[in-house]
From Swiss-Prot:
Part of the 30S ribosomal subunit. Contacts proteins S9 and S11. It comes from Shewanella frigidimarina (strain NCIMB 400). This is Small ribosomal subunit protein uS7. GO terms for molecular function: rRNA binding; structural constituent of ribosome; tRNA binding. SUPFAM superfamilies: Ribosomal protein S7. One of its GO terms (cellular component) is small ribosomal subunit.
Length: 156
């Protein structure tokens, strides 16, 4: 193994409008082809739509949506003696956030509303109320881990 030092995690600068690191990370997840300004417009428009529909703080709704989508366990493939087992493993906090954001964006992209901002707003509202495609994805992952609990002793 190389004897180089371990590279530390980069610090994410907070977004310019709300000064939130979580929102800055979410903007980076939505961004495609390096078009950050477009991603920012989509997120800020979605947050405005959420603010119109709900009287609560829109950042708290985003936080609630991500809380309801974050997985606590997932399954990883592990090969033992010629057969592959789906082994349930606990998810690290950084990965929980990353998976929640990714699933929320994927679910929003599959929705039928006219613009991406409306799709994202709809999915955030659904997820904050514990329904929607992203929450269903989390439930499926948890169900898969529960079904394979017998292989938990293969954890590494």
């Amino acid at each position: 193994m190389p004897r180089r030092r371990v590279v530390g995690q980069r610090k994410i600068l907070p977004d310019p409008k709300f000064h939130s690191e979580l929102l800055a990370k979410f903007i980076n997840v939505i961004m495609q082809d390096g078009k950050k300004s477009t991603a920012e417009k989509i997120i800020y428009k979605a947050l405005d739509v959420v603010a119109e529909k709900k009287s609560e703080n829109h950042l708290s709704i985003l936080e609630a949506a991500l809380d309801n989508v974050r997985p606590s366990v997932e399954v990883k493939s592990r090969r033992v003696g010629g057969s592959t087992y789906q082994v349930p493993c606990e998810v690290r906090p950084v990965r929980r956030n990353a998976l929640a954001m990714r699933w929320l964006v994927e679910a929003a992209r599959k929705r039928g509303e006219k613009s991406m901002a409306l799709r994202l707003a709809g999915e955030m509202l659904d997820a904050s109320e514990n329904k929607g495609t992203a929450v269903k994805k989390r439930e499926d992952v948890h169900r898969m881990a529960e079904a394979n609990k017998a292989f938990a002793h293969y954890r590494w």
